[in-house]
Amino acid sequence: KKQLRNEMKALRAACGDRAARDERVCARFFSLPASEKRSFFIYNAFSNETATAQIAARLLREGKVVCFPRTEGNEMVAVRWQGQATVKGAFGIEEPVGEPFGGEIDVCVLPLLAADGQFYRIGYGGGFYDRFLSGKKIYKVGICYDFQIVGRVPREPHDVRLDALVTDARTMIRR
Protein backbone atom coordinates (compact mmCIF):
# COMPACT_ATOMS: atom_id res chain seq x y z
CA LYS A 1 0.00 0.00 0.00
CA LYS A 2 2.80 2.39 0.93
CA GLN A 3 4.48 2.09 -2.48
CA LEU A 4 1.18 2.68 -4.30
CA ARG A 5 0.43 5.69 -2.08
CA ASN A 6 3.82 7.24 -2.83
CA GLU A 7 3.47 6.52 -6.56
CA MET A 8 0.06 8.20 -6.73
CA LYS A 9 1.19 11.22 -4.70
CA ALA A 10 4.07 11.69 -7.16
CA LEU A 11 1.79 11.35 -10.21
CA ARG A 12 -0.68 13.83 -8.75
CA ALA A 13 2.08 16.31 -7.91
CA ALA A 14 3.34 16.10 -11.50
CA CYS A 15 -0.12 16.64 -12.99
CA GLY A 16 -0.07 20.01 -14.73
CA ASP A 17 -3.69 20.48 -15.84
CA ARG A 18 -5.50 20.03 -12.54
CA ALA A 19 -7.93 22.95 -12.94
CA ALA A 20 -9.32 21.57 -16.23
CA ARG A 21 -9.48 18.06 -14.77
CA ASP A 22 -11.28 19.36 -11.65
CA GLU A 23 -13.91 21.04 -13.84
CA ARG A 24 -14.56 17.76 -15.67
CA VAL A 25 -14.82 15.87 -12.36
CA CYS A 26 -17.33 18.46 -11.11
CA ALA A 27 -19.45 18.19 -14.28
CA ARG A 28 -19.43 14.39 -14.08
CA PHE A 29 -20.34 14.48 -10.39
CA PHE A 30 -23.50 16.46 -11.17
CA SER A 31 -24.49 13.90 -13.81
CA LEU A 32 -24.81 11.29 -11.01
CA PRO A 33 -28.37 10.64 -9.77
CA ALA A 34 -26.89 10.88 -6.24
CA SER A 35 -26.16 14.58 -6.83
CA GLU A 36 -29.93 15.16 -6.51
CA LYS A 37 -29.89 14.06 -2.85
CA ARG A 38 -30.26 16.50 0.04
CA SER A 39 -27.21 16.26 2.31
CA PHE A 40 -23.54 15.81 1.47
CA PHE A 41 -20.38 15.09 3.43
CA ILE A 42 -17.45 16.27 1.33
CA TYR A 43 -13.74 16.28 1.99
CA ASN A 44 -12.07 19.68 1.96
CA ALA A 45 -9.30 19.23 -0.62
CA PHE A 46 -5.76 20.11 0.34
CA SER A 47 -2.38 19.96 -1.37
CA ASN A 48 -2.98 18.52 -4.87
CA GLU A 49 -6.10 16.45 -4.20
CA THR A 50 -8.96 16.56 -6.69
CA ALA A 51 -10.66 19.87 -5.86
CA THR A 52 -14.06 19.88 -4.15
CA ALA A 53 -14.70 23.64 -3.84
CA GLN A 54 -16.75 23.85 -7.07
CA ILE A 55 -18.88 20.88 -6.03
CA ALA A 56 -19.51 22.29 -2.53
CA ALA A 57 -20.31 25.77 -3.88
CA ARG A 58 -22.83 24.45 -6.41
CA LEU A 59 -24.52 22.22 -3.82
CA LEU A 60 -24.87 25.24 -1.51
CA ARG A 61 -26.33 27.33 -4.35
CA GLU A 62 -28.85 24.53 -4.92
CA GLY A 63 -29.91 24.73 -1.26
CA LYS A 64 -28.34 21.42 -0.23
CA VAL A 65 -26.78 20.63 3.14
CA VAL A 66 -22.98 20.57 2.84
CA CYS A 67 -20.83 19.16 5.65
CA PHE A 68 -17.06 19.04 5.88
CA PRO A 69 -15.08 16.66 8.09
CA ARG A 70 -13.49 17.65 11.36
CA THR A 71 -11.17 15.25 13.13
CA GLU A 72 -11.61 14.74 16.84
CA GLY A 73 -8.88 12.43 18.06
CA ASN A 74 -9.12 9.21 16.08
CA GLU A 75 -12.62 9.96 14.77
CA MET A 76 -14.15 12.24 12.18
CA VAL A 77 -17.37 14.23 12.59
CA ALA A 78 -19.50 16.02 9.99
CA VAL A 79 -19.87 19.76 10.53
CA ARG A 80 -22.37 21.69 8.42
CA TRP A 81 -20.61 24.32 6.37
CA GLN A 82 -22.43 27.50 5.39
CA GLY A 83 -19.44 29.67 4.65
CA GLN A 84 -18.24 30.03 8.24
CA ALA A 85 -14.62 30.19 9.34
CA THR A 86 -12.35 27.19 9.13
CA VAL A 87 -9.25 26.38 11.14
CA LYS A 88 -6.30 24.14 10.33
CA GLY A 89 -6.89 20.70 11.82
CA ALA A 90 -4.48 18.01 12.97
CA PHE A 91 -3.38 17.15 9.41
CA GLY A 92 -3.10 20.73 8.15
CA ILE A 93 -6.50 20.51 6.44
CA GLU A 94 -8.98 23.35 6.87
CA GLU A 95 -11.86 22.21 9.10
CA PRO A 96 -15.12 24.05 9.82
CA VAL A 97 -15.88 25.63 13.18
CA GLY A 98 -19.22 24.71 14.76
CA GLU A 99 -21.30 21.92 16.22
CA PRO A 100 -21.39 18.47 14.60
CA PHE A 101 -24.29 18.02 12.15
CA GLY A 102 -27.07 16.00 13.78
CA GLY A 103 -29.01 15.05 10.65
CA GLU A 104 -28.71 12.23 8.17
CA ILE A 105 -26.02 12.32 5.50
CA ASP A 106 -27.15 11.06 2.08
CA VAL A 107 -23.90 11.18 0.10
CA CYS A 108 -20.24 11.09 1.10
CA VAL A 109 -17.58 12.34 -1.34
CA LEU A 110 -14.32 10.64 -0.41
CA PRO A 111 -10.72 11.52 -1.18
CA LEU A 112 -8.48 8.76 -2.44
CA LEU A 113 -4.98 8.08 -3.68
CA ALA A 114 -5.98 5.08 -5.81
CA ALA A 115 -9.09 3.04 -6.58
CA ASP A 116 -9.97 0.03 -8.70
CA GLY A 117 -12.83 -1.27 -10.83
CA GLN A 118 -14.16 -3.25 -7.87
CA PHE A 119 -14.80 0.09 -6.11
CA TYR A 120 -12.15 -0.30 -3.42
CA ARG A 121 -10.01 2.72 -2.59
CA ILE A 122 -6.92 3.49 -0.64
CA GLY A 123 -6.64 6.77 1.16
CA TYR A 124 -3.84 8.05 3.33
CA GLY A 125 -3.94 5.14 5.75
CA GLY A 126 -5.63 6.74 8.76
CA GLY A 127 -8.87 4.76 8.39
CA PHE A 128 -10.98 7.86 9.20
CA TYR A 129 -13.48 7.34 6.38
CA ASP A 130 -13.76 3.57 6.97
CA ARG A 131 -14.59 4.25 10.63
CA PHE A 132 -16.94 7.15 9.86
CA LEU A 133 -18.90 5.17 7.25
CA SER A 134 -18.97 1.84 9.07
CA GLY A 135 -22.57 0.72 9.62
CA LYS A 136 -24.07 3.83 7.98
CA LYS A 137 -26.31 3.80 4.90
CA ILE A 138 -24.56 6.56 2.97
CA TYR A 139 -23.97 6.62 -0.80
CA LYS A 140 -20.19 6.75 -1.26
CA VAL A 141 -18.61 8.57 -4.21
CA GLY A 142 -14.86 8.56 -4.76
CA ILE A 143 -13.51 11.37 -6.93
CA CYS A 144 -10.06 11.42 -8.48
CA TYR A 145 -8.09 11.86 -11.69
CA ASP A 146 -8.34 9.01 -14.17
CA PHE A 147 -4.69 7.99 -13.74
CA GLN A 148 -5.50 7.10 -10.11
CA ILE A 149 -7.65 4.14 -11.24
CA VAL A 150 -5.50 1.00 -11.08
CA GLY A 151 -6.02 -2.71 -11.74
CA ARG A 152 -6.44 -3.67 -8.09
CA VAL A 153 -5.78 -1.88 -4.82
CA PRO A 154 -4.67 -3.84 -1.76
CA ARG A 155 -7.65 -4.31 0.54
CA GLU A 156 -8.47 -5.33 4.07
CA PRO A 157 -11.71 -6.69 5.60
CA HIS A 158 -12.64 -3.31 7.15
CA ASP A 159 -12.27 -1.39 3.87
CA VAL A 160 -15.51 0.26 2.75
CA ARG A 161 -16.45 -0.09 -0.95
CA LEU A 162 -17.53 2.91 -2.98
CA ASP A 163 -20.87 3.08 -4.79
CA ALA A 164 -19.50 5.28 -7.57
CA LEU A 165 -16.18 6.54 -8.91
CA VAL A 166 -15.98 9.83 -10.80
CA THR A 167 -12.85 10.84 -12.68
CA ASP A 168 -12.08 13.54 -15.22
CA ALA A 169 -12.60 10.94 -17.98
CA ARG A 170 -15.30 8.51 -16.79
CA THR A 171 -18.03 7.73 -14.30
CA MET A 172 -18.31 4.23 -12.85
CA ILE A 173 -21.38 3.15 -10.89
CA ARG A 174 -21.40 -0.05 -8.86
CA ARG A 175 -24.27 -2.35 -9.85
Regions found by a protein language model. Name each.
Residues 74-175:
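Conserved phosphate- and dinucleotide-binding cores of soluble alpha/beta proteins
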Residues 1-103:
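N-terminal active-site beta-alpha-beta segment that forms phosphate/nucleotide-binding
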